[in-house]
């Protein structure tokens, strides 16, 4: 078992085994990079942006950036997984668009070629120095992602469920990030009460609606800043109330100011 953290384009590679997992060990989270999670064993649910999934051994979760997700143990049964966190820029755009258009779950239990990639991670970790391990993993991960892209053409995604009201809310949020989004907006669009919209969203997503909207806007802002747009123009585009509010929220979430993000281009 191992856990290696690094800098872009590969942020984390791990193979973990947890005895007696508990809910307190796992928090809902989101991040600006993509994730592959191979569920090896355990008894749990995953919530991926409101999609509730009870995984089977060797379910591969393909999680786009800026997607809320968390692990919910159902019993103390031991939990084993592989996790790879990485920049989507690691693969060509045509594969990126296919892989990360939405969360996808594939079962690779009967696919020895798929499982070989993860077995190689263990072999590389036990054989190479930390520096050479990361170099080898970059190449292996790039190959794995391209392999995933081709396998998606012939594989049947695992079906999971999401509350249809939440599905509608998430669609409205994604389509209207450049508007002054809030619970009132969603309530009007869906012809529901504001309190009902807020309650359903928080119960299903385990995050407040206002916080979710703010963070989705910030991830969109991050992409525009990396593309060269000015911080002031990004603030106006995503309808933040004022620049100081945008600056404060951005720095708290990203760890750098919007201007620093633009200068770094990363």
Model-derived segments and spans:
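Generic protein-terminus/edge-of-domain signal
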Residues: 1-56, 60, 75, 245
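Residue at a beta-strand N-cap/secondary-structure junction
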Residues: 45, 180, 228-229
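Terminal helix-turn-helix DNA-binding modules in bacterial transcription factors
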Residues: 171, 175, 184, 199, ...
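Regular secondary-structure segments
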Residues: 40, 115-129, 170, 174-177, ...
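A hydrophobic/aromatic-rich effector-binding and dimerization subdomain
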Residues: 1-20, 60-132, 142-154
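Alpha-helical elements of Rossmann-like donor-binding domains used by nucleotide-donor carbohydrate transfer enzymes
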Residues: 120, 136-139, 143, 168, ...
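Short, Lys/Arg-enriched, Trp-marked, Pro/Gly-tolerant hinge/linker segments that flank
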Residues: 101-112, 126-138, 145-175, 179-193, ...
